[in-house]
Design a protein with these regions (language model features):
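Short secondary-structure boundary segments
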Residues: 43-44, 187-190
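Asp-based phosphoryl-transfer active-site loop
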Residues: 2-19, 177
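Conserved acidic, metal-coordinating active-site core of Asp-based
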Residues: 88-181, 188
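Short, basic, glycine/proline-bearing loop/turn elements
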Residues: 9-15, 35-37, 157
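Active-site phosphate-binding/coordination module
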Residues: 17-101
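Short, well-ordered beta-strand core segments
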Residues: 6, 62, 183-185
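Active-site metal-binding loops of divalent metal-dependent hydrolases
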Residues: 12, 44, 169-170
């Protein structure tokens, strides 16, 4: 087995409370220097990542917003391979007056507001999908998962999932695990 790609989750995997341990940055730099292609794969909104750290200095791709958005730092290209959320879904969620986190390609809230999200999806004939993760519910374009976003990034970079290890901790990491040759759930995984 030849592994040359490391795909890793953020929250609960390499970060705790919006903080990456300085030693983790050292290990990421060492892995990159040894020739590993690093890929951050997170449910976080893309714009939030800059406050946590300089991932673009380490990663060949940043798969954000639960796979709905992929950023390639080498050429500063931002891609939404599954499109944007349907306008009717966005409009109805905004009108529902629930707390929302709004990304470039997704919207998210927390339980117990998932009931409102599911009603909106039903009223819009399921023009989007929903995924739960640690008490959050993310509303995504059809086809977007961490695994599908990661496969898109690998394909664009000419890399293979057969040479990839994926590391994560939560239910939204399962699709990423399914793509990898080797999958690792960290000790505190849920």
């Amino acid at each position: 087995m030849y592994l040359n790609v490391i795909a890793f989750d953020l929250d609960g995997t390499i970060a705790q409370d919006d903080r990456v341990n300085p030693q983790t940055w050292v290990k990421l730099a060492e892995a990159k220097a040894k020739g590993f292609k690093l890929m951050l794969v997170t449910g976080r909104c893309f714009d939030d990542l800059k406050t946590i750290g300089p991932f673009e200095e380490y990663c060949k791709a940043i798969v954000a917003e639960n796979g709905a958005l992929v950023y390639f730092p080498d050429n500063e290209t931002l891609v939404m391979p599954f499109g944007q959320l349907a306008k009717e879904v966005k409009d109805q969620l905004l009108a529902s007056n629930i707390p929302l986190e709004i990304g470039k390609a997704i919207m998210a809230t927390r339980v117990p507001h998932d009931k409102t999200v599911l009603k909106v999806l039903g009223r819009t004939n399921f023009a989007a999908i929903a995924e739960y993760n640690k008490g959050a519910i993310m509303v995504l374009p059809h086809g977007a998962t961490k695994g599908s976003g990661l496969l898109f990034a690998l394909n664009e970079l000419g890399l293979s999932a057969h040479n990839m290890i994926s590391i994560g901790d939560a239910e939204n990491d399962r699709s990423m695990f399914e793509q990898a040759e080797l999958a690792v759930a960290v000790q505190n995984a849920t």
